[in-house]
Swiss-Prot record:
CC per GO annotation: bacterial nucleoid
Keywords per UniProt: DNA damage, DNA recombination, DNA repair
Primary role: Involved in DNA repair and RecF pathway recombination.
Annotated source species: Caulobacter sp. (strain K31)
Lineage, uppermost ranks: Bacteria, Pseudomonadati, Pseudomonadota, Alphaproteobacteria, Caulobacterales
Keyword DNA damage: yes
InterPro entries: ARFGAP/RecO, DNA_rep/recomb_RecO_N, NA-bd_OB-fold, RecO, RecO_C
Family (UniProt): Belongs to the RecO family.
HAMAP family the UniProt entry points to: RecO
GO biological process: DNA recombination; double-strand break repair
Protein name: DNA repair protein RecO
């Protein structure tokens, strides 16, 4: 089995004296795990960080066995964010969520492009937390658990959508949801439209929505909690006054 594809590094852990086991999110083939030789070298370390974009060349004797990969860097990778610890926290959370949520060897191009869009936005402090929420919503969509924010689940109304049902992931209008206000999730306007501006509390509301459904539909069935890096991101955004 051999292939070549663009990929993002999701994680890398030391294996032996000089190698590493690397999780990759590829553009066309989904998540793959591979052994990378020489990973301890000074040349290799920068593009084995989470979020680094590479050309991966993969080879395995048997299709059901873990193979070996060589990696060639594309661009400068996450090193440009080393002076932005909050953005690095966002990148770490995104890589951890993708690594934990995506099955191996199953194509998920939507997840690849959602991560690509987030990484491009991380250099813009004013917008990336909202783009992170959209990344998680896109991941849910690609896994078959997409939110339906197009109309009110109760009335079919297209207007004044301000809640999400925590059971179904469908939008609910203000009028229909008011009697159940305490049982519904607040829906921030930016999740409905790219033109929706951000006000205080919007990012927290968005992360609460995507976190709820990631837990309910993805991680709980796998008997796993949300990744610690994702929990820490919420804490750090709060400390920075960015929620």
């Amino acid at each position: 089995m051999e292939w070549e594809d663009e990929a993002f590094v999701l994680s890398a852990r030391v294996h032996g004296e000089t190698g590493a086991i690397v999780e990759l999110l590829t553009q066309e083939r989904g998540k793959f795990v591979a052994h990378v030789s020489g990973a301890a070298s000074r040349r290799m370390k920068p593009f084995l960080q989470a979020g680094a974009k590479v050309i991966a060349r993969y080879r395995a004797r048997m299709s059901d066995q873990m193979g070996a990969a060589t990696l060639e860097p594309m661009g400068e990778g996450p090193s440009s964010l080393f002076d932005e610890p909050l953005a690095l926290s966002g990148l770490s959370a995104a890589a951890s969520v993708a690594a934990g949520a995506l099955p191996e060897r199953e194509a998920h191009p939507g997840a690849f492009h959602a991560l690509e869009a987030l990484i491009a936005a991380l250099a813009i402090p004013a917008i990336w937390p909202a783009v992170y929420v959209r990344f998680e919503a896109g991941l849910l969509q690609d896994l078959g658990f997409g939110l339906d924010l197009s109309k009110c689940a109760a009335t079919g109304s297209l207007d004044d959508l301000v809640y999400v049902s925590p059971r179904t992931g469908r939008a609910v209008s203000r009028a229909a949801g008011q009697p159940y206000h305490d049982k519904l999730l607040p829906l921030p306007p930016f999740m409905l439209s790219a033109q929706g501006g951000l006000v205080e509390g919007d990012v927290k509301a968005g992360l609460d929505i995507t976190g709820h459904f990631l837990e309910q539909f993805v991680f709980h069935p796998l008997n796993r909690p949300l990744p610690p890096a994702r929990v820490w991101l919420l804490d750090r955004l709060g400390e920075a006054g960015r929620l």
